[in-house]
Amino acid sequence: MREEFKLKPISREAIPRAIQKAERYRLINQSWAAESICRDILEIDPTNQQVVVMFVLALTDQLVDTHAHAMKTVHETLPRITDPYHRAYYTGITFERSGQALLQRGGMGSGAMAYDAFREAMGWYERAEAIRPSGNDDAILRWNTCARLISGSSHLAPQAENAYEPALDD
């Protein structure tokens, strides 16, 4: 049996320091700790856009290990990003990182699933590009990265029309 705890709330005054800690934990590859801090901040300030974005990034940092659970939470969180450009851009980041996680995990069909994720990311980057602020070409840089990944790997290709289907006994 798992032990349950009543979590302790942080004070509103502690939010700036907590944000700095979350950023540091992401930098040292302890995204699970950054995720936890973001959850604490969002309990107090649920519309804090910097923290909503950091929460999405902390979750997507962990996709190799927790793909299904993290993706569900990410997709529930992305609509909380209020700026249309940032929402499109970070949705693209989410799909790109999902594709990278699929490639790292490998397995049957992972190349085609990763291809689909990268193509979905590219679509979101194109949406972001269309509404980007002047001088911000981040979406173009990410789109180009996905294009180079797909072009440079024979493992990344769409699912074959005549994909393998196991024979069934009559």
Language-model regions, residue ranges each:
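TPR-adjacent "capping" and linker segments in tetratricopeptide-repeat scaffold/adaptor proteins
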Residues: 2-17, 78-80, 112
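Terminal, low-structured helical/coil segments at or just beyond the last alpha-helical repeat
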Residues: 2-5, 130, 134-170
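Repeat-mediated protein-protein interaction surfaces in helical alpha-solenoids
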Residues: 1-9, 32-38, 68-76
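Glycine- and aromatic-enriched membrane insertion/assembly motifs of diderm outer-membrane
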Residues: 32-33, 39, 43-51
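Conserved structural position within tetratricopeptide repeats
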Residues: 9, 42-43, 76-83, 130, ...
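Alpha-helical segment of the N-proximal tetratricopeptide repeat
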Residues: 13-37, 107-109
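Amphipathic alpha-helical repeat scaffolds of TPR domains
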Residues: 12-17, 45-59, 82-106, 137-149
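Short coil/linker segments at helix-helix boundaries
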Residues: 59-83, 90-127, 152-166
